[in-house]
Amino acid sequence: MRRARYPLLLVAFPALAFAGYWSVRLAWSDHLSRAAEAETVARGVLLAPGDADIRIRLANQREAAGAESVAALQAAAALDPGNAAVWVRLGLYAEAHGDPGAAERCLLRAARASGQFEPRWALANYYARRADPAHFWPRANEALRMAYGDLNPVFQLCWSMSRDPALIFERAIPPRRTVLNAYLAFLLWQNRLAAAQPVAASLASVATPEDRPRLIAWCDRQLDGGSVPAALAIWNTLCNRRVLPYAPLNANGAALTDGDFAAEPLGGGFAWRLAPLAGVSAGRNPSPRYLWFSFSGKQPEACEPLAQFLPVAAGARYRLRFAYRTSEIGEESGLCWRVADARTGASLAASSPWLSSPAWKRDQLDFTTAPATTLARLALTCRRLPGATRVEGGLSLRGLSLERLP
């Protein structure tokens, strides 16, 4: 029986020895290819001539040494034609050495080999350098359809090709929510507010709560610039789609947001804004709903702990209704509501009566907008009156509403 095994052993030993030899050879080749000297990496290529990765390492070492690397890259491409990164490098090499035709062919080969962002980004840059808009825009659009991370370089390249915001938006920007969000951020950063308007509208139509901060920031920029209708259109889109937890606004009717304090103040757009003030703390009571403030007496002598922008009609009369109660605050409290033109700061009404009542109390404030007023600012003001100390105690608010009067 033992003799019968001898022929099998005679066959197995050479095969095992051959396999062991190649394992050691390939391992040694891999070790050499990771050296810092191009000559050592080249020795690794001789030991594993069919390994594309080692050819790429050789090209890297030769480039680092300032030597020619294209032969190693061409060999790597022949061994691994599906490696898009190699084709991109060959394309850039060809372009740098005055062969645009070969450069384009290599970059197109890279795009066919990979459905990822990098080959299309390389193609878009190539066509931008060639001043070829007909080929640039499709490649920029393709790149953005699969892009991730920081997209500002793509947007900057688009604006270097054209200063026409409508053309850029139509040809380059895909209807991807994440891309629209990033492009809106880019336009705000560049202060291109007019170009941002259709982008904000497109984003608002598909927005999720994740996009809310970006769109509210856009609304704030519009309000700062006096573009109330543009801000209101985006705001109402978000409200109608329940991205914002509010009812839509109407300058001819419901122009106040969340008068019952059903949601936490968002601090932007047409929502309530709580000012971070030393000596003042604030919070929302969910049931029953009201907003409360506590004044320590160490707050600034004049401050506005709460405010909201109101989209109003020019030359119209309004009535603000509200309920409040106070604790440990005297009659001359220094607390009142103030309504002003958001652009000029001019007062639109006499201030409300001083807020002071230990029990819940209903009150109202009438005001009239100026002929050019389309945005008002409602603010809760707190100031130290002459001869008095600063306010110290508590204030609660609920049931605010705003109606347009005949």
Predicted regions and their residues:
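TPR alpha-solenoid repeat register
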Residues: I54, V86, P119-R120, D150-V154, ...
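Canonical positions in the second alpha-helix
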Residues: R43-G44, A75-A76, R109-A110, A143, ...
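Extracellular and organelle-lumenal recognition/adhesion modules and their flexible linkers in secreted
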Residues: A4-D30, G149, R171-P406
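Short coil turns that delineate tetratricopeptide repeat
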Residues: L46-G50, P81, S114-G115, R145-G149, ...
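Structural motif corresponding to the intra-repeat A-B loop/turn of tetratricopeptide repeats
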Residues: E63-A65, H97, R130, Q190, ...
